[in-house]
Amino acid sequence: MKILFLCNVFPHANVVSGAINVYHRIRLLAQRGHTVGLAAFKTGADDPHIPAVRAILHEMELLPRPVQQNPFRRFPGNLFPILPHDFSVGYDPAMHRLVGSMVDRTRYDVVVAEFSVMGQYLHHNPYLSAVRRVISCHSCLTTSALKAIRLRPYAPKCWRRRLTVQRLRAVEFAMYRSADLILTLTGEERLDLLKYDPDLSIEIVPYGVDTEYFKPAPARDPEDSLIYTGFFAQEPNSDAFIWFARTVWPWLKARHPGLKLYVVGAGVTRGMREAAGNDQRIVITGPVDDVACYLARGRIFICPIRMGTGFRGKILQAMAA
């Protein structure tokens, strides 16, 4: 079978995000003899990993990750957008054309949009020929928005969410209805989508972990440290760190003078750096080539959760390590 994957984050073996699950789907399908292609967004930090991924693919086309404008420059468009914010952050008209040209060139049997934001390139894409369309929903955008509104009802972002959440729901579920199949990672996520539209065709493809890569390190005395991993451009991850740094960390470091906190992953936000301040015991690494070595170093892995939906694959990685 010929399968084209779409991803908003470049998937490779060392990526610290849910895109690592996408990488292993691609790798295992290619090993089984399928013809697999990839269209994805990337940043400069992904460049060292491109050759290894290209080697397992039939073809690969990459575009720079869309750059977000200052929200004040987009006012009032940020209140009344054509596309809801959750989709506009991953929108590039060039990706519409790219997906269409790749499908025509290679005659793919199916296109899999990983993460709901990439489903927009299968829905109302004027360049896309007839092809089976699958959307892999890692988390429901509408449920995530409603949860954020309940958690921080008076935050500036939530005023925008209140104004646009019904529009988000309409766009998200029109997109799902246009697909031939929806994939979720858990049964709970499947039921959540069916709550909005019981007629959706949904299958569950569970999350996995590479136990050859994430495995217990040789016996040694770990450093007195906490480890938190994630792709911090995603608000649930950055919000969780900011909450932990302001609420829990002061209490912990006062009782454990030698304790360190390692924050491992790309997409670190200004709000995260402000929350860390000048604390020398908080180490924000940014992108790393080997997250497993940090998991082996730490005494405790933490995964605070306040927002978002979906499955946290990093918990499986920490358990395996």
Language model regions located:
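A conserved catalytic-core segment of Leloir-type glycosyltransferases
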Residues: 39-101, 105
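Acceptor-binding helix/loop patch of EC 2.4 sugar-transfer enzymes
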Residues: 8, 67, 71-88, 133-173, ...
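N-terminal subdomain of nucleotide-sugar transferases
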Residues: 1-61, 106
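Donor nucleotide-sugar binding/catalytic pocket of nucleotide-sugar-dependent glycosyltransferases
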Residues: 132-135, 142, 161-216
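Short Ser/Thr-rich beta->loop micro-motif in glycosyltransferases that lines
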Residues: 286, 303-310
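Conserved catalytic-core segment of nucleotide-activated headgroup transferases in glycan assembly
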Residues: 177, 183, 203-297
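Short alpha-helical segment that forms part of, or immediately flanks, the ligand-binding pocket
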Residues: 292, 313-320
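Short N-terminal targeting/anchoring amphipathic segment
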Residues: 99-119, 132-134
